[in-house]
UniProtKB/Swiss-Prot annotation:
It is found in: Cell inner membrane. One of its GO terms (cellular component) is plasma membrane. Coiled coil: none annotated. InterPro entries: NADH_UbQ_OxRdtase_su1/FPO, NADH_UbQ_OxRdtase_su1_CS. This is NADH-quinone oxidoreductase subunit H. NDH-1 shuttles electrons from NADH, via FMN and iron-sulfur (Fe-S) centers, to quinones in the respiratory chain. The immediate electron acceptor for the enzyme in this species is believed to be ubiquinone. Couples the redox reaction to proton translocation (for every two electrons transferred, four hydrogen ions are translocated across the cytoplasmic membrane), and thus conserves the redox energy in a proton gradient. This subunit may bind ubiquinone. The chain crosses the membrane at residues 17-37, 91-111, 116-136, 156-176, 188-208, 244-264, 272-292, 310-330. It is a multi-pass membrane protein. One of its GO terms (molecular function) is oxidoreductase activity, acting on NAD(P)H, quinone or similar compound as acceptor. The gene is nuoH. It comes from the Bacteria. It comes from Acinetobacter baylyi (strain ATCC 33305 / BD413 / ADP1). Pfam families: NADHdh.
Length: 333
């Protein structure tokens, strides 16, 4: 059962606003910090130096990068559709940040306790497709357009598998509410009965975030950064931060849906460790896995990505859903 501070019961709107500001600020700051963490981890795994010039150990590199982006010229191509061109990064950033309001970080910490939390996430993921379409088309650049079309086709395709892979979890928990899904995992995390759904969700999540090895929409060697090739300054920075926000979002959803959210391993009760600690540790692990995938895996061809989705992920997701439904019906009988 959700517990809130006594003052929050008298001031529910103020409490929700404070939670929203705190969580969203933390998410954006962590997403910005991730660029530094990714560069350091990749350098460590590849046995080379990462950023090490700005501050002790290069720890102020992210500050230097942010200042550089903020003071770059805010340029719009002459032949671009200016309104749509400016709208695209705002849509990308807004959908990424808004998706976080349904994530329960602890039993008491969360912006919105929606009964349709998962459906809200899927809705935001669907709207996010328009950001790359707007950016690709409005730039009036062939590389941008190709990147935008690739991104739209890939994202819409893998969102189908993403949604179907979630239905097994919803069927077991009996709810679309993420807080209730976490509470349903007190006896056993859903990674055990839904391992196949977990694998499909991870693959689809990486594809939806356009991260390596599914980064064909931004393939530097083929499309010169894809749909945001014409963007610079803060507009490009919003696309950049939105990508890392999505990484944290997918990692947080993996933890919430399959690894018990804020619940301690083996249902341990350790009084001096707050529930939010377990949520942060689990999420950080999967964020590191995103970075490791970039350093370890090759990029397949675009047709291979689409074939893998429709010929492998979709059948497996449907099998997982049917088997889960059959097991639930047999248990009820």
């Amino acid at each position: 059962m959700r517990q809130t501070p006594l003052w929050a019961e008298n001031w529910p709107i103020a409490y929700s606003v404070i939670q929203a500001i705190v969580i969203l600020l933390v998410v954006v700051l962590v997403a910005a910090l991730m660029s530094f963490i990714e560069r350091r981890l990749l350098a460590w795994w590849q046995d080379r130096y990462g950023p090490n010039r700005v501050g002790p150990g290069g720890m102020f590199q992210i500050v230097a990068d942010m200042l550089k982006i903020m003071f770059k010229e805010d340029w719009t191509p002459k032949f671009a559709d200016k309104l749509t061109f400016r709208m695209a990064p705002a849509v990308a950033m807004a959908t990424a940040v808004l998706s976080f309001i349904v994530i329960p970080v602890s039993p008491t910490l969360g912006v919105a306790d929606m009964s349709i939390g998962l459906l809200f996430f899927m809705a935001m993921a669907g709207i996010a497709v328009y950001a790359v379409l707007f950016g690709g088309w409005a730039s009036n650049n062939k590389y941008s357009l190709l990147g935008g079309l690739r991104s739209a086709a890939q994202t819409i395709s893998y969102e189908v598998f993403l949604g179907i892979s979630l239905m097994g979890v919803v069927a077991i928990a009996g709810s679309f509410n993420l807080r209730e899904i976490v509470e349903a995992q007190r006896d056993m995390w859903f990674i055990v009965p839904q391992f196949l759904g977990f694998m499909i969700f991870v693959v689809a999540g990486v594809a939806v975030t356009h991260r390596h090895p599914f980064d064909q929409p931004e393939a530097e060697q083929e499309l010169a950064e894809g749909y945001h090739v014409e963007y610079g300054g803060m507009k490009w920075g919003m696309f950049f931060v939105a990508e890392y926000v999505n990484i944290v979002l997918i990692s947080a959803l993996i933890v919430t849906l399959f690894f018990g959210g804020w619940l301690a391993p083996f249902n341990l009760e350790i009084p001096f460790i707050p529930p939010v600690f377990w949520f942060i540790v689990k999420t950080a692990f999967f964020v590191m896995m995103f970075v490791l995938a970039r350093g370890a895996l090759m990029r397949p061809r675009y047709d291979q990505v689409m074939n893998f989705g429709w010929k492998v992920c979709l059948p497996l997701a449907l099998v997982n859903l049917m088997v889960t439904g059959a097991v639930i019906l047999m248990n009820q009988a």
